[in-house]
Structures are given as structure tokens and as C-alpha cells.
Design a protein with these regions (language model features):
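Rossmann-like NAD(P)(H) cofactor-binding subdomain of soluble oxidoreductases
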Residues: 1-44
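Glycine-rich beta-alpha junction loops
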Residues: 15-17, 35-36, 62, 88, ...
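Internal alpha-helical scaffold of NAD(P)-dependent oxidoreductase catalytic cores
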Residues: 48-135
Length: 180
């Protein structure tokens, strides 16, 4: 590539990886996912210790020397670094990150719909539980929609597992049993 020297290293910080693997033919590209941040983004919300003691996932694809350079970069920012493959990454984060955001958006929408129908401000009565979900749901909807779509198969599997467990709980509540 005439625009980049052989010594160059490129990394990215997206939430899904399988769709990006095709770009790792460029051996200078190393896929990263720092597990840090909050519902707000941008330079005004940064902090010097944002990555301290937080995990950063590196996708184990590319030149070992480039992976080591990116690994050192994240460690210098205070991160704990682990390597994994893209398929495993996307499967794990569908459950641990993407599904919780989807649930938060859905729960807040359910509360808003209830308010509209009942014409009562129920949100003001929410304690920590709903407030925590509303904080998560305050994240950028467009960004999360794109994350859901880019991890579609894992999201559908995660949603199906969640619905299955939710239906089991619903069945127990209907039967008024706490254990089977």
C-alpha cells in the first residue's frame, strides 16, 4: 500500500468483529474491543483512567508483531488484554453486552407505552432497577441498532434463549410456584 508503511499499525474499537475479519488480510489491521465506557460518548466524557483495570479484547488475527504492538498500547492505558477469535467474541458479547442493551431499550419502551395508555407518569416512581435500565437505554440508539444488525445471528440466538427463560419464569408465576 503506497499510503502506509510496512511498520504501520491500524486498530479499531468496534463492538462486533466477524464482519471485519475480511479486512484483516491487511496484516497491519488488528481488531480491538476495549470493554470500558458509559452511556455517553465523545471527548467531553473521556477520563484518564477510563481503561484502568478494564478488559480489552484483541482478535487473534494478523501479524504477531502487530498484535503485540496493539497489546502493549492497551496495557499502557491500563487495560487487561486477552486474545480470542472473532466468532467467540461476537457470541460472548451478544449475551453480555448487546442483549442487555436490547432489553433496556425494550423495557423503557414498555414503560413509556404504559404511561401513554394509562396517562400516568410512572417513571417518577422508578427506583434503582428501572433507573439502571434507563441509563443503559440512554446510549446512542442508532449505534446500538447497527451493533444488533452486525451481530444478527448471535443476537437472534440470545433473544431466543432469553425468551425461553422468560417464558419459564412466566409459567412459574402463573402456577404460583417458586421451584420445580
Amino acid at each position: 500500500n503506497k499510503f502506509m508503511s510496512e511498520d504501520s499499525v491500524i486498530t479499531e474499537v468496534g463492538s462486533t468483529k466477524r464482519n471485519l475479519i475480511k479486512f484483516t488480510k491487511n496484516k497491519n489491521l488488528i481488531l480491538s474491543h476495549p470493554i470500558a465506557g458509559s452511556e455517553v460518548s465523545g471527548p467531553n466524557f473521556g477520563s484518564k483512567d477510563l481503561f484502568n483495570n478494564k478488559w480489552c479484547i484483541l482478535i487473534n488475527k494478523g501479524k504477531k508483531s502487530k498484535i503485540n504492538t496493539v497489546k502493549k498500547f492497551w496495557k499502557n492505558l491500563g487495560s487487561k488484554v486477552i486474545l480470542m477469535n472473532a466468532k467467540e467474541h461476537d457470541k460472548i458479547f451478544a449475551i453480555t453486552s448487546h442483549l442487555p442493551h436490547l432489553i433496556a431499550y425494550n423495557l423503557i419502551k414498555t414503560a413509556q407505552d404504559y404511561q401513554k395508555v394509562e396517562k400516568k407518569n410512572i417513571i417518577k416512581f422508578s427506583a434503582g432497577g428501572l433507573r439502571d435500565f434507563s441509563r443503559t437505554a440512554a446510549s446512542n440508539e442508532i449505534m446500538w441498532r447497527d451493533i444488533f444488525f452486525s451481530n444478527k445471528d448471535n443476537m437472534i440466538n440470545s433473544i431466543n434463549k432469553f425468551i425461553k427463560n422468560l417464558n419459564l419464569i412466566k409459567k412459574k408465576i402463573k402456577a404460583n410456584k417458586d421451584k420445580e
